[in-house]
Structure formats: structure tokens, C-alpha cells
Design a protein with these regions (language model features):
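Short helix-capping/linker turns of helical repeat alpha-solenoids
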Residues: 1, 32-33, 64-65
Length: 90
């Protein structure tokens, strides 16, 4: 059971938005890397748990992972859209 291979498989599943499979692989992945924190952040982002997403993505970004910064930008856009939608009167 290769922990790096599991992390790569989780990332591939996340790119397909397959959160169930990604979670399965993340449970067997190397957890002490910025790439792991980024993947967990993306998992939470896709599931709509923005607080947990921000926590994990910030950890990855603080470790210097550029992709985490891009994912944080995506998270900020989603939060901004939610705020705008909440201001609309239907």
C-alpha cells in the first residue's frame, strides 16, 4: 500500500469530482505533506464545507504549495457568489 500512490489516486478522483473515491484513497495516503492538505482542502471544497476547506488549503499554502493558493482563490470566489446570492431578493 503505497501512501504516495494513494495520494495521487485521490488527486485524480478529485479532478473528476469523485469525492467518495477520493476520501477512500486519502485515508490511506501520506498525511504529512502539503499535497495531502491541499487534497483534503479540495475534498471539503467540493463537499461545500468551506471552513474545513480553508483550514487545510491554508496549511498547504503556508508550506509553499502554489496549487493551494489557486484553490484558495477558487474558494474565495465561491464564498463571494454565496454572499451575492444571499443578497438577491426572490
Amino acid at each position: 500500500d503505497d501512501k504516495i500512490a494513494n495520494l495521487n489516486a485521490a488527486s485524480a478522483a478529485l479532478s473528476r469530482k469523485d469525492t467518495l473515491l477520493a476520501e477512500k484513497y486519502l485515508k490511506r495516503a501520506e498525511t504529512s505533506t502539503p499535497e495531502y492538505e491541499n487534497a483534503v482542502g479540495v475534498l471539503h471544497l467540493l463537499r461545500g464545507d468551506y471552513e474545513q476547506a480553508k483550514l487545510h488549503l491554508n496549511k498547504a499554502a503556508e508550506s509553499g504549495l502554489k496549487q493551494a493558493n489557486l484553490n484558495l482563490e477558487e474558494l474565495a470566489k465561491k464564498e463571494e457568489n454565496i454572499e451575492l446570492m444571499s443578497k438577491l431578493d426572490y
